[in-house]
């Protein structure tokens, strides 16, 4: 009496034990955060073409670089990247809501099918827009593959892409009248 079947207490102990703490990577040293030669090459081409005042470069990790540009230059810079560097398609378009800054950042992850030497590289092209009147020029005329992704960003974050062929609903119900669901102030009803 009072004894548990063999093995049961072991499984209960395993269920109730806390999960292991996540490990964090140490911060990058200055040397580790510098861009490798290939990334430096295409970054220098972009900066020399448009100037340091129009582009902010953030090296992320090998094969991945992020540049942030003012939205008024995004079409011109995206076209240069496509025509001169060989990044020929938008692999995805993502967005992040920054309510404290009253901004939404939209990031195009650019890749290449046509140039084998950069096929593994991803160039993230980012820009920001005012959250209250979230409008950006479309990049569908530069990267046809951005069409679907911009539609999703329009619907989920409320960013209107000027010149886009179809800024309309396709995932949410047509009568959706609430905030875009990926905005940080969106609340699920009843919670």
Predicted feature locations:
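Conserved helix-adjacent loop modules within structured domains
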Residues: 1-191
């Amino acid at each position: 009496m009072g004894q548990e079947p063999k093995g049961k207490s072991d499984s209960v102990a395993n269920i109730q034990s806390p999960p292991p703490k996540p490990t964090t990577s140490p911060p990058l040293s200055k040397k580790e955060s510098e861009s490798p030669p290939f990334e430096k090459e295409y970054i220098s081409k972009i900066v020399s073409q448009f100037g340091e005042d129009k582009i902010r470069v953030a090296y992320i990790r090998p094969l991945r670089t992020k540049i942030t540009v003012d939205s008024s230059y995004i079409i011109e810079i995206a076209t240069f990247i496509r025509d001169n560097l060989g990044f020929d398609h938008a692999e995805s378009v993502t967005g992040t809501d920054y309510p404290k800054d009253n901004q939404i950042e939209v990031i195009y992850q650019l890749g290449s099918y046509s140039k084998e030497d950069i096929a593994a590289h991803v160039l993230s092209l980012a820009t920001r827009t005012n959250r209250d009147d979230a409008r950006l020029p479309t990049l569908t005329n530069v990267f046809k593959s951005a069409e679907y992704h911009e539609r999703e960003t329009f619907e989920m974050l409320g960013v209107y892409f000027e010149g886009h062929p179809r800024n309309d609903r396709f995932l949410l119900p047509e009568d959706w009248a609430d905030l875009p669901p990926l905005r940080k102030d969106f609340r699920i009803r009843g919670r």
